[in-house]
């Protein structure tokens, strides 16, 4: 039953973060992971990951050669070695979902305690290296004066090592579409993010392929997603931001951050903060007031 629940979670988080996702589950003094790779079904990447980590791949029942949900592929390592293996996985652009035992045996309760990703993992550092994550919100509007397309973006960047963050919103006319993509490219190249979130109001293969062609996404960890509808609601926006910026006097959080006239970068910024918070609730406690780029 435990392994079936694990496999369901592996499927869920692969759908959310992409194929380079690994769920690690604590089982006693080990962290284990499981998978299925047969003609009917493929769950996880246990064969690739064991080679990456240089550990042994086995099956739940070694006497049965075929693997399945009931005889899954499996591997693991001691809990005390977690930090070393996390580094290897992150260096290879994996997102790691950590499930730990939060109550004592014999029937421990397990919970997701952390989600590690290349842009949100903060380790003890002696030499400063930027740990930037960037969120890009792309939007097309129809200009009421010309009835032509207007191309708008909201870009936000957080360096989770220092808490510094930068916001940028700009719009371009239908005749300036190349400049639109060039400006996005310039921002991304400047901050060189470890992770990039690209947001669409409605995502499809066409707009995803277009942005891939227009800006250089080679060797970058990219998450394509649709905007969460709750981030369009003014009340939710202020309530969410208040948790991060509680001291804003008589102003609303949006006014305090000077975002009342920048709705597109506001969506980008909220998504980025939410992504960071989801991975590690402590990570955004040192976020500073954003600067405009």
Regions found by a protein language model. Give the residues of each.
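Basic, polar low-complexity surface loops/patches
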Residues: 1-293
């Amino acid at each position: 039953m435990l392994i079936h629940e694990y496999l369901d979670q592996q499927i869920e988080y692969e759908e959310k973060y992409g194929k380079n996702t690994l769920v690690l589950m604590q089982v006693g003094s080990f962290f284990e992971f499981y998978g299925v790779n047969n003609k009917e079904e493929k769950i996880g990447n246990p064969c690739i990951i064991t080679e990456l980590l240089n550990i042994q791949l086995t099956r739940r029942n070694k006497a049965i050669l075929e693997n399945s949900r009931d005889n899954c592929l499996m591997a693991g390592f001691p809990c005390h070695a977690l930090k070393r293996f996390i580094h290897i996985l992150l260096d290879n652009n994996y997102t790691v979902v950590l499930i730990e035992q939060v109550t004592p045996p014999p029937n421990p309760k397990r919970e997701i305690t952390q989600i590690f990703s290349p842009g949100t993992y903060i380790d003890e550092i002696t030499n400063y290296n930027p740990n930037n994550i960037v969120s890009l919100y792309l939007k097309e509007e129809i200009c009421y004066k010309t009835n032509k397309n207007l191309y708008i973006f909201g870009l936000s960047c957080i360096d989770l090592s220092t808490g510094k963050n930068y916001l940028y919103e700009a719009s371009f006319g239908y005749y300036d579409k190349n400049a639109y993509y060039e400006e996005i490219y310039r921002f991304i190249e400047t901050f060189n993010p470890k992770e990039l979130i690209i947001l669409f109001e409605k995502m499809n293969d066409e707009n995803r392929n277009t942005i891939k062609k227009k800006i250089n996404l080679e060797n970058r960890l990219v998450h394509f997603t649709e905007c969460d509808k709750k981030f369009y609601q003014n009340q939710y926006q202020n309530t969410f931001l208040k948790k991060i910026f509680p001291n804003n006097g008589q102003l609303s959080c949006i006014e305090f951050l000077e975002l009342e006239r920048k709705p597109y970068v506001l969506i980008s910024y909220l998504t980025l903060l939410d992504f960071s918070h989801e991975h590690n609730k402590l990570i955004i406690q040192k976020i500073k007031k954003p600067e405009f780029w």
